[in-house]
Amino acid sequence: MEQRLALITLGVTDFKKSAKFYLDGLGWKATEDSSNHIIFIQMNGFRLSLYPHSELAADAAVNEDRSNFRGFTLAYNVSTPAQVDRVLDFAVQAGAKLTKPPQKATWGGYSG
């Protein structure tokens, strides 16, 4: 499997405060596809995103309880749904626990 990450998403408890820190405090720039619901920041070779912790837990199909969900996700992007299935199968074979089966996402992609 190719060593690459496309997106690191941080689940934040205070979205406005976090946005202020990253955008105003650090001076990082939000991309044009950011909104008042999610912020994307282009880094060197990947994107960092800020997303409400409760919604990130729901998207990952896990309980929001911080003892089970630490509040971040890593995205490994591929081109087709079949490739997503293969990557998830590979991860499970390597010992990962699949919490959300691959499916069409509300934002238009395919993820698991």
Indicate residue ranges for each PLM-predicted region.
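Short amphipathic alpha-helices within nucleic acid-binding modules
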Residues: F21, A82-D89
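Residues at or immediately preceding the N-termini of alpha-helices
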Residues: F15, P81-A82
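Short connector loops at helix/strand junctions that flank enzyme active sites
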Residues: M43-G45, S67-G71
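Vicinal oxygen chelate
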Residues: M1, L88-G112
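N-terminal beta-strand motif that seeds the catalytic metal site of vicinal oxygen chelate
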Residues: M1-A19, G71-Y76
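Core segments of cupin and vicinal oxygen chelate
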Residues: T9-A57
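Short beta-strand/turn micro-motifs at beta-sheet edges
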Residues: A58-E64
